[in-house]
Amino acid sequence: RRASEKGVKAIFCAAGGYSDTDEAGLIAEKRLVALASELDLVLAGPNGQGIVSPHANLCAQIVAPYAPKGRIAVVSQSGNFVSSFLNYANQTGIGISRSVSAGNAAATEIIDFLEWFSTDPATDVALCYLEGLEKGRDFFERIKTITKKLPIVLVKGGTTMGGQRAAASHTGSLASDSKIFEGMARQAGITRAPNIESAFEIAATFATQPLPSGPRVLVLT
């Protein structure tokens, strides 16, 4: 409330202990979301590492491998994977436009960030790490529109039983059935990647190589 009184319009909550923990944490998270809605504040997080925007000279995250400016936007439910993507950006010199560690994504969801990236003139491709979905149908309907304007490269976590348990404890998100998710991704035009390194390489290609202007291209390897 004090922040809102000062004129703050958006807040990133890095603190954990919400839906990523227990029932009491879930209740606290719902109260946080309700307060943000009451005050008309954009809320990102909680339980995220922060945001980075090299084009605005902004690096506001807990772990901060500051990446060079580029055309790749990053959004992830895992802060560690954001750090990995930014480290690859530093190693390769292929930079990023924006980066968000969404955490529990209690109010502003992964799909909301992807929609904004699709309107961002500084972004040519979005790189996404996703552990689970609660609104699968909504995600599908919105992302298939986004991919018509912006390539999306996605790494899906929580595909094993151990990974599903880790996803639930890490971000408070339920991992989706892998076969269902694969079908959805294929229909929506998402480019799937098996791991972080491959995902960055694919995104780097989208960001640095122009797409063919027509279907008359033959590739020999």
Residue ranges and their predicted role:
Residues 1-221:
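Catalytic-core regions of core metabolic enzymes
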